[in-house]
């Protein structure tokens, strides 16, 4: 699974739909996903709310990458280092669900996840060119 992360209105649902159309991807949630780490690795989970997309499937899939989205006129992608990745991810976590005093546990989980899951920054256009740019970077075929 590829998880798109961004503030509301940036284009998560748009990029997910483009991947569905151009790469045959299955979208398990159009807004937010849960993430777990277990003996089998890092997994993304559909959640029972979907934002504006209406897509929320009760599915889990191995997480292969997280992509922080930004809007741009030209497509640019780069892999984020650990500190950059944690900062970007923390901006998009539902902090309301983290109990007081548990923030360090959340950061520790992110650090563990980053050992196997790369995080990218994709500043992109809302069209097929963005899909191609990301697919090329992730080495995903047609």
Predicted regions and their residues:
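Glycine-rich, often acidic-flanked micro-motifs
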Residues: 2-6, 20-142
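Post-Walker A alpha-helix
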Residues: 15-16
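Conserved lysine of the Walker
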Residues: 12
């Amino acid at each position: 699974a590829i998880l798109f992360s961004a503030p509301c209105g940036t284009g998560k649902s748009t990029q997910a739909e483009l991947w569905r159309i151009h790469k045959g991807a299955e979208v398990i949630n159009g807004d937010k996903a849960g993430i777990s780490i277990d003996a089998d690795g890092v997994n993304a989970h559909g959640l029972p709310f979907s934002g504006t997309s209406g897509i929320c499937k009760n599915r889990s899939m191995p997480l292969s990458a997280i992509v922080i989205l930004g809007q741009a006129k030209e497509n640019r992608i780069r892999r984020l280092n650990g500190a950059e990745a944690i900062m970007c991810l923390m901006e998009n976590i539902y902090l309301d669900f983290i109990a007081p005093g548990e923030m360090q546990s959340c950061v520790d989980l992110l650090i563990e996840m980053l050992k196997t899951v790369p995080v990218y920054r994709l500043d992109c256009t809302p069209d097929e060119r963005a899909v191609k740019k990301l697919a090329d970077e992730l080495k995903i075929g047609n």
